[in-house]
């Protein structure tokens, strides 16, 4: 252990980096908790198993093999390379050098794997960049993917390349330095050993390059960590709790408003006793209004969805409404929810929805009238909501179990129950149900007229 001024500087930088991230994470947590309460406790084993398969195991990614393979490389590389980050943190605080070298063959296996994965990450990032900027992948386009979202996707790729370059610079310079000094460097460096020829033979220059690579790598990681809350890549953290708290009941089953359900049952059966505690999974506290007009009307799990979105567009690419030219984009619903939260409550350090991306969604006059903004109409139009066929294709496609349909249904409920603003076709159906007991405009007495020319002659008996 050797303490120096450099260790003090490192400790201050590390504390500032992690502290700033914790501050941003707390702001995001506060945003999520403005949502309505929803009981998602219980079924721990089932939830853990789903998290293991979907979040850790990337199960739903492999429906599209090419991006799944590329993403797997970056994902595994991210996990393994972070083992070296632990070593850098220990070295930076205590003044040691490659403190985990005592692990011998295991350390060599780790550093060798680290290097190979680092090279593969660079190749995968290049492929991702081409898919976003060189090829035409339809799901990477759309009005919601202009300005900040498009820039953010590329910034992340550039940061990942810079981090890998810093890593190889540190390792290659350190390896050549030890070779010149006739010393053995713990570990295996299959990629860096190929790069040593690019480095000078000066011991002083190699010392400088090794330190530059070391500092660039760890400071870059801390900067990346604090960029995450402003980026779609925050999903690398939020995907795990989002999958854990995702709904377990069948996708086709909607959660009714309990208070309305109990009222209807009590009207039909005077002996019906309204239960006090909610019993169904996902049951919410009694609402002050029906449905959702703004983000605070949605459940906290819906707001957690918004921070878990990868903006990959898989949901929109399978949406039948979007595919037939309707305005609805499930991805936009989720992105709008996040933007509205950060407009109304807490914004992260870098991204502020008041500054980026709004030209694709609002005219200048709307931007000046932010106090009157709500999620419904301010960001999401009724036309988008009523285009939804409630088919659950978006939910099935999402690799991190986001459920845009829940938010859509809640905003529809507000339109119908609070504003009586359902489309005319639905209003006709509601009137028919009220007057005729069926969605169709036929008298109940005429309900069996279709059977007149069939073998059924005793319609009274058929209805008995």
Report residues per predicted region:
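Iron-sulfur-cluster electron-transfer modules
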Residues: 2-130, 134, 297-300, 306, ...
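P-loop NTPase catalytic cores that bind/hydrolyze ATP
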Residues: 217-221, 231-236, 312-313, 388, ...
């Amino acid at each position: 252990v050797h303490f120096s001024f450099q260790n003090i500087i490192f400790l201050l930088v590390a504390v500032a980096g992690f502290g700033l991230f914790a501050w941003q994470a707390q702001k995001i947590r506060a945003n999520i908790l403005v949502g309505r309460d929803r009981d998602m406790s219980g079924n721990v084993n089932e939830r853990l198993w789903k998290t293991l398969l979907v979040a850790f195991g990337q199960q739903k990614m492999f429906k599209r093999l090419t991006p799944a393979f590329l993403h797997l490389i970056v994902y595994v590389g991210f996990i393994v390379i972070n083992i070296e980050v632990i070593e850098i943190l220990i070295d930076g605080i205590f003044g040691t050098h490659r403190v985990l070298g005592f692990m011998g063959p295991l350390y060599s296996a780790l550093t060798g794997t680290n290097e190979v994965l680092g090279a593969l990450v660079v190749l995968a990032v290049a492929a991702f960049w081409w898919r976003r900027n060189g090829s035409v992948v339809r799901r990477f386009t759309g009005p919601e993917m202009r300005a900040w979202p498009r820039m953010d996707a590329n910034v992340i790729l550039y940061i990942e390349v810079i981090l890998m370059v810093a890593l190889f610079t540190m390792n290659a310079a350190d390896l050549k330095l030890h070779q010149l000094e006739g010393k053995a460097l713990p570990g295996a460096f299959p990629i860096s050993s190929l790069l040593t020829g690019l480095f000078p033979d000066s011991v002083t220059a190699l010392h400088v390059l090794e330190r530059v690579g070391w500092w660039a790598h760890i400071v870059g990681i801390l900067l990346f960590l604090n960029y995450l809350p402003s980026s779609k890549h925050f999903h690398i953290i939020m995907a795990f709790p989002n999958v854990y708290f995702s709904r377990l009941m069948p996708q086709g089953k909607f959660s009714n408003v309990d208070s309305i359900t109990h009222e209807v049952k009590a009207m039909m059966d005077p002996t019906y006793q309204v239960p006090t505690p909610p019993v169904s999974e996902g049951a919410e506290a009694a609402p002050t209004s029906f449905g959702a007009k703004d983000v605070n009307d949605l459940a906290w799990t819906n707001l957690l969805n918004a921070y878990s979105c990868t903006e990959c567009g898989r949901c929109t690419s399978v949406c039948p409404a979007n595919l037939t030219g309707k305005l609805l984009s499930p991805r936009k619903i989720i992105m709008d929810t996040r933007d509205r939260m950060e407009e109304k409550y807490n914004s992260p350090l870098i991204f502020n929805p008041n500054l980026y991306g709004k030209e694709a969604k609002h005219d200048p006059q709307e931007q000046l009238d932010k106090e009157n903004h709500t999620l419904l109409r301010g960001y999401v139009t009724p036309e988008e909501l009523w285009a939804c066929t409630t088919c659950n294709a978006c939910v099935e496609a999402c690799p991190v179990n986001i459920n845009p349909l829940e938010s859509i249904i809640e905003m529809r409920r507000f339109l119908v129950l609070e504003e009586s603003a359902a489309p005319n076709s639905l209003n006709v159906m509601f009137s028919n149900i009220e007057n005729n007991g069926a969605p169709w405009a036929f008298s109940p007495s005429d309900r069996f007229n279709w059977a007149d020319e069939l073998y059924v002659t005793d319609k009274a008996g058929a209805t008995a």
